[in-house]
Structure formats: structure tokens, C-alpha cells
From Swiss-Prot:
Compositional bias ranges of the Basic residues kind: 21-38
Disordered as annotated region, ranges: 21-40
Tree of life domain: Eukaryota
UniProt-recorded name of the protein: Uncharacterized protein YLL066W-B
Length: 56
């Protein structure tokens, strides 16, 4: 029971760090992609946020 609630906050914090770290080097790449396909940029961001969730 104690492990369950502990994993919940851990996953949230990990997700925040993962997105922040990936967001830093992504702006440069996203900028080029945004010019080509702005819709793809939105999908990429969504996939990144969903990736850490199921990965856990």
C-alpha cells in the first residue's frame, strides 16, 4: 500500500524532469519542424508527455 502512493508522485516528478530536459534541446529542432509541419510539433509534444506515463 505504501509503495503505491510513493510511485504515483515519483512518476509525476520524473515526467516533469523528462519533459523539461527534452524540451531544452527540442526547441531548435521543433522550430525547423514547425515551419514544415506545425501539426506534427503538437503530436510530438503529446507523445513525449504520454511516453513517460506508460513507460512507468
Amino acid at each position: 500500500m505504501s509503495l503505491r502512493p510513493c510511485l504515483t508522485p515519483s512518476s509525476m516528478q520524473y515526467s516533469d524532469i523528462y519533459i523539461h530536459h527534452t524540451h531544452t534541446p527540442h526547441p531548435h529542432h521543433t522550430h525547423t519542424h514547425t515551419h514544415h509541419t506545425p501539426t506534427h510539433s503538437l503530436t510530438s509534444t503529446f507523445t513525449l508527455a504520454v511516453t513517460p506515463y506508460p513507460a512507468f
